[in-house]
């Protein structure tokens, strides 16, 4: 069964490359058997990024004579956001087609058309759907098998609603998969187009059992948020599945660039309102990140008396609350007195805004749990130090990547609030643990209000103010050259891109 799931994932890997950089894929395949060391390095770097653009350096081309087109291959070359917005304003009936998360925008004469994913990528989605059905026939879990069949149908229609409901309803499955176009990280033009991502997962029952404390209080944290009552959805944030998984195979959006250690899905606000979301924590990826990246960076950049505070348990708690917090806050924006999609309202900067909201509301939630006596207040130093060490790791990506954009903004805000200070003599950073809760609460209020109002201008101005890498931090990060930027997963299943 796992082999069939991986086979389906390899088909979606082939689709992701065509969403990201079809020309880069041609070069990747051409270099596959080249013996030269330079060719091998280029081949491997193409694999890391799923394109000829460095996803962690603002899509900077790393191949000669290449130019990055915003939105990757999801839009026509040379198109601008203004051109799309002007076209839709003149042709309002085309808005749903052009702005759909599941269409590739193309030119047709003087018009713009949205080609459905299931049409554009049909030659890979058909075999992927077959492999999912084959896997379903091999599963002894009836609910999981039913989900796989529904997801196979969804691949061929771009309608994921029914299969998403079935996925959220899975009860402690031994095996699970993420298998859909969910995230919009490739779309830095409109911020609405999704890319395919896959994770084949095996449940870690012991670690999953530890999540019960967090699950119990999700609704209470939602009620406690610094947000007007009418902007708090009635069901979003209520207890939903939370699983710790090991992922022996990932592809597509989950394979290239930033290596996620957790996910909170689906992103469909209808599912949020009806069911909530499922939170997945990739234990094998988290272990690698913390041990090989986060802890070493903390020891280099944090003041010596705080450098040993970040921990695996602290980082896990921060990540758990981050993923829970993706499902907290407003499900829609209020724009001109009407309900509007938050992604569409905020635009391309939405991904960074949402990652920041999840970070900060997550810390706010940890404060709430400590203040209510659910978690010991003695853990506060551990939680804050683990998050700040994580910031240092993330901003090494450059501030164009969504998570890095979010955490660069957080860092600068905390510095402004004196919750983080720098020792000019040593160049190391320290946390003022007395000031951090207030800074977290005020930032949570700002980010939640931006999402609730759908105020794109306010969002862009906020990130412009706080989104620049300070020179002193850039200098400090130069000392971390021997620490990996991220983990580079190696799978025994192979890539097998077609």
What are these regions (language model features)?
Residues 4, 87-352, 356-368, 373-391, ...:
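Fold-level signature of zinc-dependent metallopeptidase catalytic domains
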Residues 7, 82-90, 212, 216-219, ...:
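Polar/charged alpha-helical tracts
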Residues 10-14, 140, 144, 156, ...:
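Residue-level signal for secondary-structure boundary elements
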Residues 80-81, 204, 262, 376, ...:
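Helix N-terminus capping/helix-initiation residues
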Residues 444-498:
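Extended, compositionally biased alpha-helical segments that mediate assembly or anchoring
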Residues 363-460:
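Long, well-structured alpha-helical subdomains associated
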Residues 9-11, 21, 35-38, 69-72, ...:
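Serine/threonine-rich low-complexity intrinsically disordered regions
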Residues 1-139, 143-147:
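N-terminal helix-rich structural modules
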């Amino acid at each position: 069964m796992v082999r069939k799931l991986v086979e389906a994932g390899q088909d979606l890997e082939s689709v992701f490359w065509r969403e990201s950089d079809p020309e880069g894929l041609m070069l990747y395949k051409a270099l596959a058997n080249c013996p030269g060391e330079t060719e091998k390095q280029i081949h491997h770097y193409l694999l890391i990024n799923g394109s000829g653009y460095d996803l962690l350096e603002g899509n900077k081309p790393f191949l000669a004579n290449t130019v990055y087109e915003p939105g990757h291959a999801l839009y026509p070359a040379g198109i601008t956001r203004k051109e799309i917005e002007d076209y839709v304003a003149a042709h309002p009936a085309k808005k749903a087609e052009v702005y759909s998360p599941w269409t590739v925008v193309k030119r047709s004469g003087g018009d713009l058309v949205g080609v459905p994913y299931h049409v554009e990528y049909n030659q890979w989605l058909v075999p992927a759907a077959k492999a999912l059905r084959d896997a379903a026939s091999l599963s002894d879990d009836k609910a999981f098998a039913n989900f796989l069949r529904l997801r196979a149908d969804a691949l061929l229609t771009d309608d994921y609603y029914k299969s998403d409901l079935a996925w959220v309803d899975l009860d402690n499955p031994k095996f699970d998969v993420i298998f859909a176009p969910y995230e919009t990280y490739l779309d830095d033009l409109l911020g609405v187009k999704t890319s395919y991502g896959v994770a084949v997962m095996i449940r870690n029952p012991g670690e999953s059992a530890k999540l019960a404390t967090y699950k119990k209080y999700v609704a209470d944290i939602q009620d406690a948020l610094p947000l007007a009552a009418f902007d708090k959805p009635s069901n979003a944030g209520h207890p939903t599945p939370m699983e710790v998984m090991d992922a022996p195979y990932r592809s597509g959006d989950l394979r290239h660039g930033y290596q996620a250690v957790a996910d909170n899905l689906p992103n469909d606000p209808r599912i949020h309102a009806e069911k909530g979301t499922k939170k997945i924590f990739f234990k094998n990826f988290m272990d690698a990140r913390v041990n090989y990246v986060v802890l070493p960076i903390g020891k280099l950049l944090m003041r010596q008396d705080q450098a040993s505070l970040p921990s695996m348990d602290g980082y896990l708690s921060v990540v758990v609350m981050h993923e829970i917090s993706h499902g907290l806050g407003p499900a829609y924006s209020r724009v001109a007195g009407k309900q509007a999609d938050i992604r569409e309202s905020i635009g391309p900067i939405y991904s960074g805004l949402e990652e920041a909201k999840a970070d900060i509301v997550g810390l706010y939630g940890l404060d709430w749990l400590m203040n209510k006596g659910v978690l010991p207040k003695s853990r506060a130093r551990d939680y804050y130090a683990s998050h700040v060490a994580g910031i240092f790791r993330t901003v090494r990506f450059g501030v164009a990547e969504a998570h890095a954009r979010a955490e660069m903004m957080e860092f600068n805000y905390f510095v402004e609030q004196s919750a983080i200070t720098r020792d000019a003599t040593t160049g190391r950073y320290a946390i003022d643990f007395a000031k951090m809760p207030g800074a977290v609460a005020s930032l949570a209020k700002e980010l939640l209000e931006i999402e609730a109002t759908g105020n794109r201008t306010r969002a862009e101005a906020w990130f412009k103010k706080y989104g620049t890498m300070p020179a002193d931090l850039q200098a400090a990060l130069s000392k971390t050259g021997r620490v990996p930027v991220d983990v580079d997963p190696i799978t025994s299943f192979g890539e097998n891109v077609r």
